[in-house]
């Protein structure tokens, strides 16, 4: 029963991490695109220039996020697969050394000598490779993250996050364009700050204020920069 509970907790934690990464990706989309469209709108009232600038920023940001996530997850997957291959080789060449290695890992992870010995014996009766990679490296055996899935998730999250600033800067009339966008972006940042804090079990108020301040600072700087080149 405890092993089943452990697997359920691990799967749940994995899903939470994916969801939290999605929220943070959306947050990047909000702040990045808000900064671009506010800066451009500060420099010109031409809606096509604003739209094309925002669209280019969305595409560049989304592909950059997706590419970075793909490289990161691919590297992690390669490392994990190498660890599995290394432990499989150890099992094939020297079973006693593999047992001692797992026993030492249990001790290092806080088990007493008796418990570590019992767990080691039990693991070698069931799935020693699974126990070795999970205890020694903290890897979820045969649960490698697909880099293409991770890249697609980052791409979608960034695009979804970019929608509030992009749509508001286009929809509202020119005289209300910037203040309305700032307001909508501020609300969006409060929501993502609250959500990410909840998922990470961190203080929500601090996260919301921090997120809002970063967004307002970004928009403020790009607005002033746009004023310097107003056309």
Where are the predicted features?
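Interhelical loop and helix-boundary elements at the membrane-water interface
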Residues: 10-26, 88, 142-145, 199-209
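Core segments of transmembrane alpha-helices
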Residues: 29-34, 154-165
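Residue-level signature of catalytic and energy-coupling elements of molecular machines
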Residues: 28, 67, 106, 116, ...
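Internal alpha-helical transmembrane segments
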Residues: 1-72
């Amino acid at each position: 029963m405890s092993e089943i509970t452990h697997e359920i907790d691990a799967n749940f934690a994995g899903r939470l991490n994916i969801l939290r990464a999605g929220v943070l990706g959306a947050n990047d989309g909000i702040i990045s695109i808000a900064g671009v469209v506010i800066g451009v709108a500060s420099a010109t009232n031409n809606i096509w220039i604003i739209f094309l600038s925002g669209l280019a920023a969305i595409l560049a940001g989304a592909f950059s996020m997706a590419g970075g996530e793909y490289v990161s997850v691919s590297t992690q997957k390669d490392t994990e697969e190498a660890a599995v291959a290394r432990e499989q080789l150890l099992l094939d060449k020297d079973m006693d050394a593999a047992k001692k290695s797992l026993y030492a890992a249990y001790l290092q992870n806080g088990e007493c000598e008796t418990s570590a010995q019992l767990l080691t014996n039990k693991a070698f009766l069931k799935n020693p490779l699974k126990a070795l990679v999970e205890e020694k490296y903290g890897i979820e055996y045969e649960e490698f993250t697909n880099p293409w899935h991770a890249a697609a998730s980052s791409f979608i999250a960034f695009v979804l996050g970019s929608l509030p600033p992009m749509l508001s800067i286009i929809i509202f009339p020119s005289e209300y364009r910037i203040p309305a966008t700032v307001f909508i972006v501020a609300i969006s940042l409060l929501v993502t700050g609250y959500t990410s804090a909840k998922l990470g079990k961190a203080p929500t108020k601090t996260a919301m204020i921090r997120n809002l301040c970063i967004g307002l600072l970004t928009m403020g700087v790009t607005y002033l920069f746009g004023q310097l080149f107003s056309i």
